[in-house]
């Protein structure tokens, strides 16, 4: 029996259960929960990619998708929560739905997404108003089963990119604090998470992973995967693999 057969059986069982309680006192208490479970069965698995700044999250997202979509670089690039999912956008020129914090939505281009990355004053002013960006892709087989979430890095250090303007630094810290909480929230509510390390685990890594474990949303060793990135740049990292298992 394959996965589709099992899913169909569970879906039908939920249907039968909903029909059974339709005319009972249980209806008001359980009908919405049953419908929610059916919706989850039909939805793709949500896989969040998290990790410290410059750990290689966007490189991994591009590798999983098989195309260069997520912007990458040697400095911090992902400054927004970027979601890649199955779907047909209204136009090829503007395939990304930008959801603002005030609830406003607007279709934007890939160039607009790229303009949000980094820590310049202009980028900070734009990203400060954005909740998330959703890129719809219709011809990628992976997205039939998985919705990928590229999250902002955690543990950023202001000044790494030559930023010395106090107002910009304060804005960066405020935005980073919100994005770090967004990353924790998204990772806690995702079906699975890939966490990237590129060095011996730090307190930042440990605290973040502890927040997932204690979050009560089901991220465990079964659906949480740790990935040691950039080992080709420093093969001695492999010798320290025991540090990652503690």
Language-model region placement:
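Membrane-targeting and insertion segments and their boundary/processing signals
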Residues: 4, 27-30, 34, 54-58
């Amino acid at each position: 029996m394959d996965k589709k057969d099992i899913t169909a059986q569970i879906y039908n069982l939920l249907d039968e259960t909903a029909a059974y309680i339709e005319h009972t006192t249980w209806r008001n208490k359980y009908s919405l929960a049953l419908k929610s479970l059916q919706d989850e069965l039909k939805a793709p698995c949500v896989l969040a990619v998290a990790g410290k700044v410059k750990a290689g999250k966007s490189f991994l997202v591009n590798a999983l998708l098989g195309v260069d979509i997520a912007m990458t670089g040697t400095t911090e690039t992902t400054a927004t929560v970027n979601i890649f999912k199955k779907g047909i956008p209204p136009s090829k020129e503007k395939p990304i739905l930008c959801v603002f914090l005030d609830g406003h939505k607007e279709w934007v281009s890939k160039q607009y997404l790229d303009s949000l990355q980094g820590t310049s004053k202009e980028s900070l002013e734009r990203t400060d108003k954005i909740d998330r960006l959703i890129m719809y892709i219709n011809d990628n087989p992976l997205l039939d089963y998985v919705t990928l979430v590229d999250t902002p890095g955690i543990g950023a250090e202001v000044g790494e990119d030559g930023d010395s303007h106090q107002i910009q630094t304060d804005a960066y810290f405020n935005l980073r604090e919100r994005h770090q909480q967004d990353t924790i929230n998204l990772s806690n509510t995702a079906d699975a998470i890939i966490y990237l390390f590129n060095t011996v685990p730090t307190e930042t890594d440990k605290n973040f992973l502890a927040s997932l474990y204690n979050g009560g949303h089901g991220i465990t060793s079964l659906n949480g995967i740790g990935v040691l990135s950039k080992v080709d740049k420093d093969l001695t990292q492999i010798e320290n693999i025991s540090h990652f298992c503690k």
